[in-house]
Amino acid sequence: METIVIIGAGASGLACMNELVKTNKYNIIVLEQSNKAARKILASGNGRCNVSNLNMDIKYYNHQDPLIEKLIKEFDVVNFFKQLSLKLRYEKNLVYPYSLSSLSVKKCFNEKYG
């Protein structure tokens, strides 16, 4: 089994780990410089952690990069968090953890992967 090393246990690193674990093909090691995984997740949205916006569109980005547009269209953030068993709530177009606490986002990764 090949080993993949992910540098950084922030939102992207944890999401990458989640997708790789699903394949069951790799031994995965996540390296984090600080003593806390998901440190910026905990600080995001004044501790509420807005996980997505239902009105995602390339026009809201500074660059009209085709890769970004493709990712916006193909990656379902809401479904991603539902698969991690994170309950969500909606306030207008914004998507938050139901608890309105960024700690819930971190916990959903911890509960699935330790």
Please provide the spans of the model-predicted regions.
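General beta-strand structural signal in soluble alpha/beta enzymes
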Residues: 30-32, 90
